[in-house]
């Protein structure tokens, strides 16, 4: 008996240090909240053993979610405006120009896998968040499911991270624990790899759209544009009247993406105590199927509004040149558009001081704004700027389908012109100058009025000069002049008979010569395009 007790005590003494050493290792493997593993994690967290009751709950959750009957193409849809009536064409006088405004019905259909993040909802956005795939997600107000969570694995795509350093296991996937895990991954890269990769270039995602309606821009950029436009303040009223042209640009500089390993079964994302009945009570059903944020892009998001009061058809080309930095020195019209345009920028991220910046300026300064934050480092921290969701049922990508109709407004300016008459011939001359002026009735139909110069068919002796001012809506200009020869058989001889001339800024009509040899010229200065 004593020998047995001695052996037993010896075994206890031998095993005690081993147990203490094991406890120390376990303690060092978790943070204070016992939520994040600091060791290199496996590709996906191992499923912890379940009791028979917990396994029953997990099986019921899997069966329920995988049995939800819905069409993934119809779950997330944004229907914008429907246009029934297109306003008619109209024209109006504006200073020394006549403006013609035309409207056409257009439509936009956009499939967005990436949902934009703005500051107001960044607190709801984190990798692995469980959300309902419904209209609130479409409206960029994700309805996060408040349930207990199991573990998940995050990975980051910063360069150089080896030996599983780019991954981390979150034992209890709450928002705070996940955000702490993301910070741990970023800090791990800063400490171990940043020196070897001092200039990590941001991945650029660029999209633009000429602005005509808010519904159109929401369909293009997602419902996050509603919040962005509170700062951009696109002037839809002036655009609709043809007095402004504006373009909106989304410019993303992505520093890194944090991705979530796909769950092998839906229940893997839930805590052991969660039941099917709890999910049903939270409104999870075929109309509100569960999804999860599978990837979050961190970086700098710039929204730009480019504005001009030019009526030129080259405005889009000028804006593109300003953004790309392309030289337009050889094109006077593009140069003038850029010179007389402005921009407003709303910037999220990329600054250690301010999370959101609003900047106004001239297009000449635009490139400086876009160049900032081009590389990732401690001084240019990234914020969540976009996220992707997947259906929990089958890990299929959850795509938001946006569509809207809108009225495209275009305007063209026709500058006033002038005809300068100079008669220095050795004869009596008579002129007949006429033109048409075009306006529009309330239905947009053309109203053409024929106009005549008040001095038509009146005899003029040399030296006679006059100027006829024509409005921008003048067209089909006819210039006729004849001279008196004094010959009985040909009392009047035609000097000039030019018809259907276009309106130009300065048209110089000169006649000279003798009764038998009259001459003329028709020269144009500063033609109007």
Curated annotation (Swiss-Prot):
Q: Where is this motif: Conserved undecapeptide?
A: 483-493
- Species of origin: Listeria monocytogenes serovar 1/2a (strain ATCC BAA-679 / EGD-e)
Query: After translation, how is this protein modified?
Result: Phosphorylated. Phosphorylation does not appear to be required for ubiquitination or degradation.
Q: Which residues carry this modification: Phosphoserine?
A: 44
Variation of activity with pH: Optimum pH is 5.5. Cytolytic activity is undetectable at pH 7.0.
One Gene Ontology MF term: cholesterol binding
Q: What mutagenesis or variant effect is reported for residue 394 to W? A: 3-fold increase in hemolytic activity
Q: Which residue windows are coiled coil? A: none
The keyword Iron-sulfur belongs to this UniProt entry's keyword annotation: no
Protein name stated in the entry: Listeriolysin O
């Amino acid at each position: 008996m004593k020998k047995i007790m001695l052996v037993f005590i010896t075994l206890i003494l031998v095993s005690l240090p081993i147990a203490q050493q094991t406890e120390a290792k376990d303690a060092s493997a978790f943070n204070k909240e016992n939520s994040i593993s600091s060791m290199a994690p496996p590709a996906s967290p191992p499923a912890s053993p379940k009791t028979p009751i917990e396994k029953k709950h997990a099986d019921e959750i899997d069966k329920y979610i995988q049995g939800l009957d819905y069409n993934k193409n119809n779950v997330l849809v944004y229907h914008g405006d429907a246009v029934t009536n297109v306003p008619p064409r109209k024209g109006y006088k504006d200073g020394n120009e006549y403006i013609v405004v035309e409207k056409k019905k257009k439509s936009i259909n956009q499939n967005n896998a990436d949902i934009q993040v703005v500051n107001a909802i960044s607190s709801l956005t984190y990798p692995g968040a469980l959300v309902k795939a419904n209209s609130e997600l479409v409206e960029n107000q994700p309805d996060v499911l408040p349930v207990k969570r199991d573990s998940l694995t995050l990975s980051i795509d910063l360069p150089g991270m080896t030996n599983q350093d780019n991954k981390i296991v979150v034992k209890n996937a709450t928002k705070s624990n996940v955000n702490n895990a993301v910070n741990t991954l970023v800090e791990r890269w800063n400490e171990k790899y940043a020196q070897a990769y001092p200039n990590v270039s941001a991945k650029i995602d660029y999209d633009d759209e000429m602005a005509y309606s808010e519904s159109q821009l929401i369909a293009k950029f997602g419902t996050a544009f509603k919040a962005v436009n509170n700062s951009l303040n696109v002037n839809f009223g002036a655009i609709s009247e043809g007095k402004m042209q504006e373009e909106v640009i989304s410019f993303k500089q992505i520093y890194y993406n944090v991705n979530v390993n796909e769950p092998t079964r839906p229940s893997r994302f839930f805590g052991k105590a969660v039941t099917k009945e709890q999910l049903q009570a939270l409104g999870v059903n075929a109309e509100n199927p569960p999804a999860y944020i599978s990837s979050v892009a961190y970086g700098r998001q710039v929204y730009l509004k480019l504005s001009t009061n030019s009526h030129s058809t080259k405005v889009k080309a000028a804006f593109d040149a300003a953004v790309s930095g392309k030289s337009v020195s050889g094109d006077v019209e593009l140069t003038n558009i850029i010179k007389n345009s402005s921009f407003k920028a709303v910037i999220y991220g990329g600054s250690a001081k301010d999370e959101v910046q609003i900047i106004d300026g001239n297009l000449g300064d635009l490139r400086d704004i876009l160049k900032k934050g081009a590389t990732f480092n401690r001084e240019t921290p990234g914020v969540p700027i976009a996220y992707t969701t997947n259906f929990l049922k089958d890990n299929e990508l959850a795509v938001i389908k946006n569509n809207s109709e809108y009225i495209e407004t275009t305007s063209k300016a026709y500058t006033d012109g002038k005809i300068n008459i100079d008669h220095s011939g050795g004869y009596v001359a008579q002129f007949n100058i006429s033109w048409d002026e075009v306006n529009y009735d309330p239905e947009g139909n053309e109203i053409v009025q024929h106009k005549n110069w008040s001095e038509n068919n009146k005899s003029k002796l040399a030296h006679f000069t006059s100027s006829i001012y024509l409005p921008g809506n003048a067209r089909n200009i006819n210039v006729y002049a004849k001279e008196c020869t004094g010959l009985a058989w040909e009392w009047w001889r035609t000097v000039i008979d030019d018809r259907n001339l276009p309106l130009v800024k300065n048209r110089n009509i000169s006649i000279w010569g003798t009764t038998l040899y009259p001459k003329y010229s028709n020269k144009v200065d500063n033609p109007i395009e």
